[in-house]
Amino acid sequence: MKLFPLCLSALVMSTATCASSVEGAIEKVPQSLEQKGPSEMLSMKPDVKGGFGDRMMFIPFQSDLGLHSPVDRSGFEYCGYLDAIESEDGDSSRAPYAKLQLKENVEGIARFGLFYHPSPFQAFKHIIDNGGKYSGLDRVFLENLRKSLVVSLDSAVNRTYSIPVEDEGFYCFVGYQEVAHQETVIGENSEPIVTIEFDSFNSNVPVTLKLQRQIFLSFSIVYGLISLWWAIRCICSRTKLHLVQVCLFCWFSFFILNHPVKQRIFSIDNPDEYLVPFVVSCFTYFLGDGIEYALYSLFITTTVLGFGTIRRTSKKMVLFFSLLTCGQAFLVNVAPMVYPLLYISGSDKACVLRMVWVFNKFLYLPLITFLGAVLAFRFRLKKASQFDTRWNLFALTLAIIILFAFNDLVIFDKLQKLWKYDDTTLEYLKIVNGGIKFVAFSILLGPYSKLFAEPKSLQLDDFLGKHDGHKDPSLEKF
């Protein structure tokens, strides 16, 4: 199992940098960011026992705050995935820690803050969301950093500082330095000054672990029964499944797997097990953030555009939506892992990739919702005498979708920030939020099935191009 951290480091750093060492990572920094002076005085010293040197990344860059300063003020970033490595003497009472120290040939002050993410995959998403925030500091960010410093190393007072690392995850030390360079031996500037040392976690099992298991198991059973009851009810109804019903069921099935079922399966007695955090992280990233998000986006798209509810669709549209879902899942999984490499190498494609990412994450669903509302209102004016009931249902569904979007962007986002260090509470919030969505949408889709019980014009056979001769004039294309 001791080989596992090395395998994980290869995965993490293959997406963030192609270098196998700190020197290799610095060589890939664009010349506009590369500094050959004081910024090279902050680097990394791998701990031989931990074998951590080939999976850390140090990136220096020039800060615009040093234009009128008598001493050079340059920024630095230092990122890596810290995990627990069992010490040779078997002592498990000490947690891992990061020890940072100024070199002997440095006079000045280094100020920096610590950023932490439990999952390296999620950290990549934060990087692309913020446009490479961890590889650059602007004026506003530096001012905020100065007000809430974690560490301030002063060569006249203290050259060394140790930060305890109590949780596994992706750590970034981001800050700037005010140093005066001294003449020294050739090649000494490239020597590392930051030391990372490891000890295993305390193996005591949390008292609340059994209670958490019971809660996640209860969520899994209750949500599974709700989805099963709803699926049987739809299948046994007089009408066949509609497209939006299929999309809703697929999304909620993956939601159950990604949240309560995952948490129940991977809640183990031994928190020192290396494989579990990595499996949970991969499970959430590829299945949850990729497939689950794409399926939820597909459900919202088909609902707001009225396919299967207020208008007829076709075999080509089903194929188009399938390809769109695959494309979104691919983008969500791959883009955050490719973006750091493009950003560090100075490629112009990094900006294009981030624009596509921002559009898909923040603009796609609002634009689709607005387009669906415009088309439905146009259809309402055109088919006023035949569309009253369906229009009222669609308007209510659209209002609920907008309400849930507001909840996700404002209320739920603030709750996530409030409990950002409590992963269990965050999972509870996500599970409850997803369950409320499913119940609300399943209730709203019920009246549509009753409307189409007699003329089976919106059955799944129609979606596949198999018509039974019935045709609803209110569902003509417009």
From Swiss-Prot:
<feature type="transmembrane region" description="Helical">
    <location>
        <begin position="290"/>
        <end position="310"/>
    </location>
</feature>
<feature type="transmembrane region" description="Helical">
    <location>
        <begin position="318"/>
        <end position="338"/>
    </location>
</feature>
<feature type="topological domain" description="Cytoplasmic">
    <location>
        <begin position="236"/>
        <end position="240"/>
    </location>
</feature>
<feature type="signal peptide">
    <location>
        <begin position="1"/>
        <end position="19"/>
    </location>
</feature>
<feature type="topological domain" description="Cytoplasmic">
    <location>
        <begin position="311"/>
        <end position="317"/>
    </location>
</feature>
<feature type="topological domain" description="Lumenal">
    <location>
        <begin position="339"/>
        <end position="356"/>
    </location>
</feature>
<dbReference type="GO" id="GO:0005789">
    <property type="term" value="C:endoplasmic reticulum membrane"/>
</dbReference>
<dbReference type="GO" id="GO:0005794">
    <property type="term" value="C:Golgi apparatus"/>
</dbReference>
<keyword id="KW-0472">Membrane</keyword>
<feature type="transmembrane region" description="Helical">
    <location>
        <begin position="428"/>
        <end position="448"/>
    </location>
</feature>
<feature type="topological domain" description="Cytoplasmic">
    <location>
        <begin position="449"/>
        <end position="478"/>
    </location>
</feature>
<dbReference type="GO" id="GO:0000139">
    <property type="term" value="C:Golgi membrane"/>
</dbReference>
<feature type="transmembrane region" description="Helical">
    <location>
        <begin position="241"/>
        <end position="261"/>
    </location>
</feature>
<keyword id="KW-0812">Transmembrane</keyword>
<feature type="topological domain" description="Lumenal">
    <location>
        <begin position="262"/>
        <end position="289"/>
    </location>
</feature>
<keyword id="KW-0333">Golgi apparatus</keyword>
<feature type="transmembrane region" description="Helical">
    <location>
        <begin position="357"/>
        <end position="377"/>
    </location>
</feature>
<feature type="transmembrane region" description="Helical">
    <location>
        <begin position="392"/>
        <end position="412"/>
    </location>
</feature>
<keyword id="KW-0732">Signal</keyword>
<keyword id="KW-0256">Endoplasmic reticulum</keyword>
<feature type="topological domain" description="Lumenal">
    <location>
        <begin position="413"/>
        <end position="427"/>
    </location>
</feature>
<feature type="topological domain" description="Cytoplasmic">
    <location>
        <begin position="378"/>
        <end position="391"/>
    </location>
</feature>
<feature type="transmembrane region" description="Helical">
    <location>
        <begin position="215"/>
        <end position="235"/>
    </location>
</feature>
<keyword id="KW-1133">Transmembrane helix</keyword>
<feature type="topological domain" description="Lumenal">
    <location>
        <begin position="20"/>
        <end position="214"/>
    </location>
</feature>
<dbReference type="GO" id="GO:0005783">
    <property type="term" value="C:endoplasmic reticulum"/>
</dbReference>
<protein>
    <recommendedName>
        <fullName>Uncharacterized membrane protein C569.06</fullName>
    </recommendedName>
</protein>
